[in-house]
Amino acid sequence: MKATIAQLDASLLAREWEALKHHIAAESPDMLLLPEMCFAPWFCAEPERNVSVWNAAVSTHERWIKRLPELGLTLVVGTAPRNEDGNRYNAAYLWTAERGIQWIHRKTYLPNDDGYWEANWYDRAPIDFKPVTIGELSIGLVICTEIWFMGHARDYGKRGIHLLLCPRSTPAFSNDKWLACGRTAAVVAGAFCLSSNHAGRAKHVALGGAGWICDPDGAVLALTSETQPFITLDVDLAQAEAAKRSYPRYVDDRPI
């Protein structure tokens, strides 16, 4: 299947959207992974929650999600701020041309430090990491910080995922660290690891871009940049299936 990763500057969203549509028209991918809460500027750079800013971001994401059919795709994955039963969540969605929007995961591991005051802005969700199946494709979601908790990658791999998807918003100074994590998570899961990231600036935070596609043995197949903000590659789902039978994935780690 052909998969697209992206880095997006939320302050230039209208322009970025048109460029993304052009790329998709040229490459005809089967799926697109968007960055974490990408349809509004990164508001978590502010340490104090502002209810008006939060609600505006929720509304903005709702409007942009309604525009996903413009891309002409069958499958899009991303995250959005969401009000749910009196709580605020960073929720992952799966959009398909056939069924529209499905909410498939909510972020549970929340950073709370300079530029990333997420625990101040929204609620921690219960721990719930379940693969999602779309036809013959199986995906697992880890939203940004969640990828560091490798037990979930291992569990997803045992449950047969092909793609480990990591929408994120991370700073430029940490790009090398995050890529190392993505490569490791791919190996642990025995799956392709895809990540899309914010670019540009949010207040004093320089956002890193550098979305990636890593194969199940951790090789970096693609890395986005300012000059190449969108990349589409063929990923062989059979390679992810075969990886489950090779080292280190086959090792028995059940308690004895």
Labelled PLM ranges:
Residues 14-23, 147-154:
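Short, acidic/polar
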Residues 7-13:
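Short polar catalytic/cofactor-binding loops
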